[in-house]
């Protein structure tokens, strides 16, 4: 679309901004249009502001026939002054009829059509319209600082190219409410592509007309004569004034360009097609993304989209655990002093140590001594010893008893003890010997070991022998008492060996010689 803009200088010169450069001359702008025949247009709003007295009926007659859709019933609008409301209704109907006629017969693109679709009649009579006599006089302070007058700016509205006619066509409810006239814009902001798009214009016109008739809401003028705008039902983020091509009228009749630019920056991007590029390069970057329509759909509804970058919520910072002081030790539980009563207990009496009494020592006889005595004497009267011990058998009487003094005088018994009473106690329960008084003998078979004596031989020799034995025993007892106080004696009487039968016979025939040792023991 940039090439179309550069190749059509005539169309760019016909933009509303170019018209403001011609000081509002409608004839000059029409003469420059090569596509449509020139036709002078007299705007009804120009007559209203100037105070011309052209009748509204003549304006309605010149407008020509319109389509049946333009004859929709419209509620009359209450005027500011005492003027009849029919004039305003007729003016609105004429404007609506011109718009519908252009929508139906706008297929011929011979030339650009004026806004109000009728030539201006210079010979029209000038008369007061809509109670102009009751309007307050405009002061000099309300004039714009621009060199152009308000009348010149209103004249420039008479001839507008068809590219902006779609934006300047206003529904019934909004066209009357927005009675302001745009101030001349800067030449640098001219639309570089004013190519008309009649199909899009017709669709917007029909849509705006349908919305205006469907709503049925008519704005009421204020008491001061300025028109207020009702809230629009259009969900577009941009204002309805920019969509319809009319800026809101200031109290002074002019518009500040800086305010308009700030309004555009705050309410959305201004639709400017710079060769298919978006307006983001001009510093007007906001979160509302606009689609570029290359100048054909400049009045289309802006489309909202999701932001390019959505900042995620910052991660929550976990608090650093601070130092926790240790809990102090709880104080001790107070104990009431009145309950602390001292208790006294008597001490234990002093125990005097028990004095040691006389010591008693009991003499326990050695058990092995009895066993030793019993074993040794039992051996003397055993069969193995009596066979060879003729000496012991010689002390036996006819009944086989042997005196205890003879047995106690033996060497083995004398080493154990010399106490005859102790020997008797050791032999009380012996199964081999028998003790009767001071004599002892073999318990069984004692007659087998008694020696036979010759009656002829039993003379003084036998008596001497018995005396010698008794003497020896007496000496033994005396020696025991003198040598050993306990009763022991070192000298022991050894029994004679058992003699055989031949020896006994020889001994019976021959006298037995006693060989006494120095200690008196018989060997």
From Swiss-Prot:
GO terms for biological process: abscisic acid-activated signaling pathway; leaf senescence; response to abscisic acid; response to jasmonic acid; response to salicylic acid. Keywords: Abscisic acid signaling pathway, Acetylation, Cytoplasm, Jasmonic acid signaling pathway, Phosphoprotein, RNA-binding. Residues 1-16, 32-44, 146-169 have a biased composition (Low complexity). It is found in: Cytoplasm. CDD domains: LAM (cd07323). Disruption phenotype: Impaired abscisic acid- (ABA)-, salicylic acid- (SA)- and jasmonic acid- (MeJA)-induced leaf senescence in detached leaves. Its main location: cytoplasm. Pfam families: La. GO terms for molecular function: mRNA binding. Residues 22-31, 206-270, 282-305, 477-516 have a biased composition (Polar residues). Gene3D superfamilies: Winged helix-like DNA-binding domain superfamily/Winged helix DNA-binding domain. PROSITE patterns: HTH_LA. Residues 363-452 form the HTH La-type RNA-binding domain. The modification N-acetylalanine is found at residue 2. Residues 1-52, 95-313, 474-523 are annotated as: Disordered. The modification Phosphoserine is found at residue 33. Belongs to the LARP family. PANTHER family: LA-RELATED PROTEIN 1 (PTHR22792:SF132), LUPUS LA PROTEIN-RELATED (PTHR22792). Promotes leaf senescence mediated by abscisic acid (ABA), salicylic acid (SA) and jasmonic acid (MeJA), probably though the induction of expression of senescence-associated genes (SAGs) and defense-related genes. This is La-related protein 1C. It comes from Arabidopsis thaliana.
């Amino acid at each position: 679309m940039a090439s179309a803009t550069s190749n059509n200088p005539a169309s760019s010169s016909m933009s509303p901004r170019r018209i403001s450069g011609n000081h509002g001359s409608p004839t000059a702008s029409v003469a420059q249009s090569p596509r449509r025949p020139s036709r002078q247009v007299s705007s009804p709003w120009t007559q209203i502001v100037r105070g011309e007295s052209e009748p509204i009926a003549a304006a309605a007659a010149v407008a020509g026939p319109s389509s049946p859709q333009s004859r929709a019933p419209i509620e009359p609008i209450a005027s500011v002054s005492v003027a009849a409301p029919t004039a305003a209704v007729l003016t609105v109907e004429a404007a609506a009829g011109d718009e519908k006629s252009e929508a139906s017969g706008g297929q011929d693109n011979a030339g650009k059509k004026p806004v109000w679709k009728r030539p201006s009649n210079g010979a029209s009579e000038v008369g007061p319209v809509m109670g102009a006599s009751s309007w307050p006089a405009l002061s000099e302070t309300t004039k714009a600082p621009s060199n152009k007058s308000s009348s010149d700016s209103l004249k420039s509205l008479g001839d507008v190219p068809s590219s902006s006619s779609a934006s300047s066509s206003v529904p019934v409810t909004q066209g009357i409410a927005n009675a302001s006239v745009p101030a001349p814009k800067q030449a640098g902001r001219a639309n570089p592509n004013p190519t008309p798009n009649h199909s899009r214009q017709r669709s917007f016109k029909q849509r705006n007309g349908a919305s205006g008739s469907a709503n049925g809401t008519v704005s009421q003028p204020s008491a001061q004569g300025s028109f207020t705008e009702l809230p629009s039902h259009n969900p577009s983020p941009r204002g309805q004034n920019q969509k319809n091509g009319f800026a809101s009228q200031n109290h002074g009749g002019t518009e500040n360009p800086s305010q308009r630019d700030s309004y555009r920056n705050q309410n959305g991007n201004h639709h400017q097609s710079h060769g298919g590029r978006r307006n983001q390069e001009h510093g007007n970057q906001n979160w509302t993304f606009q689609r570029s329509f290359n100048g054909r759909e400049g009045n289309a509804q802006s489309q909202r989209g999701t932001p390019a970058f959505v900042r995620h919520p910052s991660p929550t910072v976990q608090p650093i655990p601070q130092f926790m002081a240790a809990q102090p030790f709880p104080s001790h539980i107070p104990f009431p002093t009145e309950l602390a009563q001292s208790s006294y207990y008597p001490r234990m009496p002093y125990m005097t140590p028990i004095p040691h009494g006389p010591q008693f020592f009991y003499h326990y006889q050695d058990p092995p001594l009895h066993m030793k005595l019993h074993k040794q004497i039992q051996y003397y009267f055993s069969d193995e010893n009596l066979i060879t011990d003729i000496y012991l058998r010689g002390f036996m009487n006819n009944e086989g008893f042997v005196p205890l003094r003879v047995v106690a005088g033996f060497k083995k018994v004398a080493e154990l003890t010399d106490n005859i009473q102790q020997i008797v106690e050791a032999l009380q329960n012996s199964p081999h010997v028998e003790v009767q008084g001071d004599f002892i003998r073999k318990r069984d078979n004692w007659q087998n070991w008694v020696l036979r004596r010759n009656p002829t031989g039993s003379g003084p020799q036998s008596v001497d022998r018995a005396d010698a034995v008794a003497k020896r025993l007496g000496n033994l007892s005396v020696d025991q008492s003198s040598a050993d106080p306990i009763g022991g004696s070192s000298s022991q009487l050894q029994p004679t060996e058992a003699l055989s039968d031949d020896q006994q016979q020889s001994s019976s025939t021959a006298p037995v010689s006693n060989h006494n040792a120095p200690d008196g023991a018989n060997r």
